[in-house]
Curated annotation (Swiss-Prot):
Gene: ureA
UniProt name for this protein: Urease subunit gamma
EC annotation from Swiss-Prot or TrEMBL: 3.5.1.5
Record lineage: Bacteria, Bacillati, Actinomycetota, Actinomycetes, Mycobacteriales
EC category: hydrolase
Gene Ontology molecular functions: nickel cation binding; urease activity
CDD domains: Urease_gamma
InterPro entries reported in the protein's UniProt record: Urease_gamma (IPR012010), Urease_gamma/gamma-beta_su (IPR002026), Urease_gamma_sf (IPR036463), Urease_subunit (IPR050069)
Catalytic activity: urea + 2 H2O + H(+) = hydrogencarbonate + 2 NH4(+)
Subunit structure: Heterotrimer of UreA (gamma), UreB (beta) and UreC (alpha) subunits. Three heterotrimers associate to form the active enzyme.
Compartment list: Cytoplasm
UniProt pathway annotation: Nitrogen metabolism; urea degradation; CO(2) and NH(3) from urea (urease route): step 1/1
Length: 100
């Protein structure tokens, strides 16, 4: 199977998010890269499901809470941006202050 660099990036994000979700299910708090992966995967899958940019910008802020991540992660994570593929094309989705 041959994947483009873009497809490889998406696959890596998906796997990193899945690993982070398993760790969270075991009661571990997520570090910065794990938190970014989970939020990014949520945005990419939401776009694939046909949700709008506005919906994803709102829902992206409720994926993780301060209790889900290690100390200091919310302060380090100001924005999460990803170019997601929607039914009508690719759009940039930005979630400001994604961890409340």
């Amino acid at each position: 199977m041959r994947l483009t660099p873009h497809e490889q990036d998406r696959l890596l994000i998906s796997y990193a998010a899945e690993l982070a979700r398993r760790r969270r299910a075991r009661g571990l708090r997520l570090n910065h890269p794990e938190a970014v992966a989970v939020i990014t995967d949520h945005l990419l899958e939401g776009a694939r499901d046909g949700r709008t940019v506005a919906e994803l910008m709102v829902s992206g802020r409720s994926v993780l809470t301060r209790d889900d991540v290690m100390d200091g992660v919310p302060e380090m994570l100001h924005d999460v941006q990803v170019e997601a593929t929607f039914p009508d094309g690719t759009k940039l989705v930005t979630v400001h202050q994604p961890i409340a």
